[in-house]
Regions:
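A short acidic, Gly/Pro-enriched loop at the edge of an enzyme's catalytic core
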Residues: 93-103
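Conserved class I S-adenosyl-L-methionine
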Residues: 1-36, 49-53, 70-73, 132-160, 189
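Core SAM-dependent methyltransferase catalytic element
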Residues: 178-180, 195-213
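Class I SAM-dependent methyltransferase SAM/SAH-binding core
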Residues: 41-91
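A short SAM/SAH-binding and catalytic strip from SAM-dependent methyltransferases
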Residues: 101-117
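A short glycine-rich, Lys/Arg-flanked "PGG" loop and its adjoining helix->strand segment in the class I
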Residues: 117-132
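Short alpha-helix
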Residues: 162-185
C-alpha cells in the first residue's frame, strides 16, 4: 500500500513535534544489546537519529522511510548508512530478500499503518531464517484513558484516521499470519518524555518475535 499525502503530512507533523531527541530509548538499547556485525533494518526511520544509534551499537544499519526530504537530511548527516525510500507496509524488493538479522519497528510506527498485514509480511520477507523483530511502541490502552483515568475512547473500535489504534491482539495475529513467532511481550508504565501517563496503566510495550526457519 502506498502512503497517501495525508499519511505523509501526519508523519512529518509528528516528527517535527517530538520534543525529545529521536535516538533509542534506554530500555530499547538494553533490549538490543550488542549489535556488532548484525544487519539491521529500521522501519520509518525519519531523520535517521535512531538508525544512527543502531549503527553506534555496532549494526550494519539500513533506514527506510517514505519521505525523501528526511532521507536526504539523513544521508547528509550519516553518509555511511544505507537510506532507502519506501513504505513500511510494502517493502521495496531489494529489502525483501531475507538478509536482515533484525528489524526494528520503533515508537509511532504502528499508529501510521493502514495495512498491518503488509507490514508484518514485509518484516518476514526481510528477515533471514531465525531473524528477529523488535517492536517498541505506544500501548493502545494509553490512548483510551485521559489524565483523570477516565475512558475517553473505545479500545475495541476499529482502527481509522491518520492515527490508528491497533490492539495488541491485532498486532500479534498479523505477525502470526506472517509466520513470525512472538517470543515475549513486555508492558511498561509511565511513558516517554512526550507522553506521560499514570503509572497504573501501560504506556508503551516491547514485543519480540522471530521468523520461523
Amino acid at each position: 500500500m502506498e502512503p497517501t499525502d495525508e499519511n505523509l503530512r501526519a508523519w512529518d507533523v509528528v516528527h517535527r513535534a517530538r520534543p525529545e531527541p529521536l535516538g533509542l530509548p534506554p530500555l530499547v538499547q538494553r533490549a538490543l544489546g550488542d549489535l556488532t556485525g548484525k544487519r539491521v533494518l529500521h522501519l520509518l526511520c525519519g531523520g535517521g537519529e535512531a538508525t544512527a544509534a543502531l549503527a553506534e551499537l555496532g549494526a550494519v544499519a539500513t533506514g527506510l522511510d517514505p519521505r525523501p526530504a528526511l532521507l536526504e537530511t539523513a544521508r547528509e548527516r550519516w553518509p555511511t548508512i544505507l537510506w532507502v525510500d519506501g513504505d513500511p507496509q510494502a517493502l521495496p524488493p531489494q529489502l525483501r530478500r531475507g538478509r536482515f538479522d533484525l528489524v526494528y519497528s520503533g515508537e509511532g510506527v504502528l499508529g501510521r499503518l493502514a495495512d498491518l498485514d503488509g507490514w508484518a509480511a514485509g518484516v518476514a520477507a526481510a528477515l533471514r531464517a531465525r531473524g528477529e523483530l523488535l517492536v517498541f511502541d505506544d500501548h493502545p490502552v494509553a490512548d483510551c484513558v485521559d489524565g483523570l483515568l477516565r475512558w475517553r475512547s473505545d479500545y475495541f473500535r476499529e482502527p481509522g484516521g491518520p492515527d490508528r489504534l491497533w490492539r495488541i491482539g491485532q498486532v500479534v495475529s498479523a505477525l502470526a499470519r506472517a509466520r513470525l513467532h512472538v517470543e515475549a511481550l513486555e508492558e511498561y508504565p509511565g511513558g516517554t518524555s512526550r507522553r506521560r501517563h499514570d503509572r497504573r496503566i501501560p504506556a508503551t510495550f516491547l514485543l519480540y518475535a522471530r521468523r520461523e526457519a
